[in-house]
Amino acid sequence: MKNIIKILFLALTATGFSQQIDADKSAFAHTFSIVARDAETGEMAVAVQSHWFSVGSLVSWGKSGVGVVATQSFVNPSYGPKGLALMQEGMSAEAALEQLIAEDEGKAYRQVAFLDVNGNASAYTGEKCVVYASQITGDNFSVQANMMLTDQTVPAMAEAFEKYSELPLAERMVEVLKAAQAAGGDIRGKQSAALIVVGPELVENPWEEYKINLRVDDHQNPIEELDRLLKVARAYEYMNRGDLAVEAGDMPEALKQYGTAEMMFPDSLEMKFWKAVAMANDGQLEEAKPIFKVIFEQNENWREMIGRLVKPGLLTVSESEVAEIQKL
């Protein structure tokens, strides 16, 4: 692979390409992606797959209350932060993209899509992107791809986005990636994938920026792995709600949230453990004991954990009941 890239760089340099873009800094994220907005929730997202390592660290950009960006082909990462800044200043996706394209000497090699908080989408495919390369832009979305095996990838993505309109935005985006791969996908194969989702309103704190931020940097089946991670992420959303209920002293609500998480991710000992803790705190110790026993049989560390929960108040049963649990 390294030799192939060196040869390609030499060829591009000989044709004057290096004067148009910085060949040493431009990554080969030839790929397929979608930028989209949920018309009901206002959430915005980017989903991407490529036969390139860690595609999510290059292609996908987003800011709550502003918009999302996908920058690919011979990637100029500056389209991400610059595009978001322009849209935050009030420019539409189309105007922001047009301005940055006009300033880019390497635009012939770029493929970029912008989507703003109002659902306006705009995309650009440079004339020197590797075929098959195209884009389709519609209400609240844009799908784009380059270096595809066939010319059916992009139409399949657009069709899938419309088909799965009843799904939450994140799940809908994954279905679009699946459709792209089923239509042939990247001519080189599969390696990495990513998904980000941001909200419709500006946030105060950096850690609130992403509702979902998942990356599969190197995997034989990156889309399938991304789909699995999304399911796990959804389960942990219920775990987080359970934690908040514990903080609020609402043990019945915590038990409800932990139980839902466990149903979604039944192989997780941790989810079983916190459900059992919530049950014990809610006066259901006898019902919790069989769950604790199964957990301890699989991993003794959880037995040790029981004693550590007393001081911070995460386990509120009596001292004798703590001993009962630890003896299971």
What are these model-predicted stretches?
Residues 266, 300-301:
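Short coil turns that delineate tetratricopeptide repeat
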Residues 247, 281-282, 315:
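Register position in tetratricopeptide repeats
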Residues 274, 308-309:
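Canonical tetratricopeptide repeat
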Residues 19-188, 195, 217-250, 259, ...:
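Alpha/propeptide regions of enzymes that mature by internal proteolysis
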